[in-house]
Amino acid sequence: MPKKPINIDEKILVSIIAGSVSDKEIYEKVEKVLIDNNINYDLQIISAHRNPEQLDDYVKNSTSLIYIAVAGLSAALPGVIASKTKKPVIGVPVSAKLGGLDALLSIVQMPPGVPVASVGIDRGENAAYLAIRILDLLK
């Protein structure tokens, strides 16, 4: 269920991609901060495991400057996105199982050349604040 960006006349600056609607509580934290700061964004629910072709197409065609990937369990989503783009990717581990430690470790243990920034477990708001800081560098 993609949401409309804040202002459809402006370029989408941040793409929020969640692996599942079960991550809603976390990606809504991201949305709130972006809305409060007037940052144009897009929200997609795309699983790296169940919808790899859809994810490929989305990343390939996206004009976003930054990706925020919200994922739990094996949390492959941020790394898969990072492998397909040179744009910054911020991973948000979700505390689905093992308190989110499994997701956190999946996000931070990436191979060389596939960088993913990570915020704390369930800290969607910090991912949004980090994205805003990155965008501020472009001003």
PLM regions and their residue ranges:
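C-terminal binding/interaction regions
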Residues: 3-7, 18-25, 29, 99-139
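Glycine-rich phosphate/diphosphate-binding loop of Rossmann-like nucleotide-binding domains
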Residues: 11-48
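Short glycine-rich or small-residue beta-strand-to-loop segments that form or flank ligand, phosphate
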Residues: 13-20, 66-69, 90, 115-118
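Short, ordered loop/turn segments at secondary-structure junctions
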Residues: 21, 46-48, 72-73, 94-97, ...
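Short, solvent-exposed amphipathic alpha-helical segments in soluble enzyme
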Residues: 29-36, 83-86, 133-135
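Glycine/charged-rich beta-loop-alpha catalytic/anionic-binding loops adjacent to active sites
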Residues: 39-40, 64, 86-87, 109-116
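N-terminal beta-loop-helix "entrance" segment that forms/cooperates
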Residues: 43-63
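Glycine-rich phosphate-binding loop
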Residues: 56-93
